[in-house]
Amino acid sequence: MIVEMNKITLKEIRFKKLKGLSNVTIKFSKPLTAIMGVNGSGKTTVIHALACLYNPDGNGENHIFPEFFTPNTDASWSGSELEAVNEIIGTDGVPTLLPPKKYYKAFDRWAPRYQTRPKRNVYYIGIETCLLSLIHISE
């Protein structure tokens, strides 16, 4: 089921295994969530995974897992697994939790197929984006 983008909200993400994250659940119960921690605690892993959960509606950015989790000699990412729990608001205004959407890499490719991801615009702003903007402003 593909849901209209403005009616879907991420409520929870569960990392079974992704990089250094193992059996970690993050709940998104408020409109704004801060991802904080010491260096190496997995903040960037969380942000990269969040950027890959959705299909854009045509205006957003289309991030895919290999963009951030590139296979290399040290890590193929095989065995990685996470789940996202989304909520939709029905036409009657009643919120409904959707079944968890599982994302994983069993062998050589990530699943599920990208076209089956829920629709929601995502804009990833990394440190490189911020630095390039600052350089452009100062010129």
Regions found by a protein language model. Name each.
Residues I135-I137:
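Conserved small/polar residues in nucleotide/adenosyl-binding loops
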Residues T33, L82-A84, V122-Y123:
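A broad, low-specificity signal marking well-ordered, structured residues that form hydrophobic/aromatic
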Residues S29, T45-K102:
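Conserved P-loop NTP-binding catalytic core
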Residues L18, P31, E87-T91, E128-C130:
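Generic structural motif
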Residues I8, L21, G79-E81, R120:
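A general secondary-structure signal for short beta-strands and their flanking turns/coil
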Residues M1-K16, D92-R117:
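A short, basic N-terminal segment
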Residues M1-H48:
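Pre-Walker A-like glycine/lysine-rich segment at the N-terminus of P-loop NTPase domains
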Residues Y114-L132:
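Extended, charged alpha-helical "arm/stalk" segments used for dimerization and assembly
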